[in-house]
Amino acid sequence: MNSIISWVGGKKALRDLIYLRMPKNYDRYIEVFGGGGWVLFGKAPDKCMEVYNDFNSNLANLFYCVKERPMALLRELSFLPLNSRDEFTTLRKFLTMEEFKSEHLAEELEIATHFLKEPEATEIRDILMERAAVGDVKRAAAFYKIIRYSYGSGCTSYGCQPFDIRKTFTIIWEANRRLKDTVIENKDFEALIRQYDRPNAFFYCDPPYFETEGHYEVVFRKEDHVRLRDTLKGIQGKFMVSYNDCAYIRELYQDFQIEAVTRINNLAQRYDNGSEFPEVLIANYAMEERKKSMPMQMNLFELYGEQKTVRWKGKETEEEPQDT
């Protein structure tokens, strides 16, 4: 199935290729930079543990509400009309309000401070703050509508295109069923990876692309790219990372398998029809292991594509052509 939202850097155009390169066996699947969840939603549910994570609290809250409070979310969507640029701006301001928290949060924090001693008081306050960040249906509904009505789903400018929000009700119910057994997290990538790392874990990482970080709401600096590499370098499990193809990323991940791939550049289609965007998939395992286990008919089908260069720990080899 498709995601309920479009999102910057979404992997709809690349996900079939990603599935073919996932490990053959794993017991837990973790999307570290979940975004719109396109890879997760398109992946057939299985018996393994699934985790969706994004450091953007609005995204994590939206998917939490889709999973845990679908009826309340649908109700809120019905009562949030959006017919003009002014209303769009109002909703954006609404999402950034510091007061946009549980109406009882201040009282609960005060009670915890008054009746508990340290360090228990701090621990309880942290739990209360974390709980207040998720399950906020009004915020989820406002964020969902901002995405739907903004230009290019970028959440920054009004798209001017009419859209009937009621058409998404079925999609939300389908997403609710798909997320039934999925854990929703809102953590920094390093903390999340260390929490879920096991020898049988598989982490799919789709971080903000290098030197395009300004298109994302969450700040991601050059040192964060290095921190991600260093974190992944020490894990017990397996990982795959998708990035834009550039010299810096290739150098940063030179000790791992790197495969060059391309996808249609949706943002450029209006001005340059057929334009493609170069990307790389990076892994700490042999990405061809799943493809080699497939029937010959599937391998023959994959031959209808152009040849790709694979870099594996400093060595370059030619791989079978892939359908991109």
Labelled PLM ranges:
Residues M1-G34, W38-V39, P45:
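S-adenosyl-L-methionine
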Residues I4, N25-Y29, C48-M49, L179-V183, ...:
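Short active-site oxyanion
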Residues I18, Y29-K43, Y52-N56, F63, ...:
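Conserved proline-anchored active-site loop of SAM-dependent methyltransferases
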Residues G42-D46, R194-R198, Y248-D255:
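Short loop/helix-cap segments at secondary-structure boundaries that form the rim of catalytic
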Residues P45-V183, L300-F301, G305-T309:
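Class I S-adenosyl-L-methionine-dependent methyltransferase module
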Residues S157-Q161, Y209-R227:
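Mobile active-site "lid"/loop adjacent to the S-adenosyl-L-methionine
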Residues V183-E185, E259:
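General small-molecule cofactor/ligand-binding pocket signal
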Residues R221-T324:
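Long, positively charged, glycine-interspersed low-complexity recognition regions
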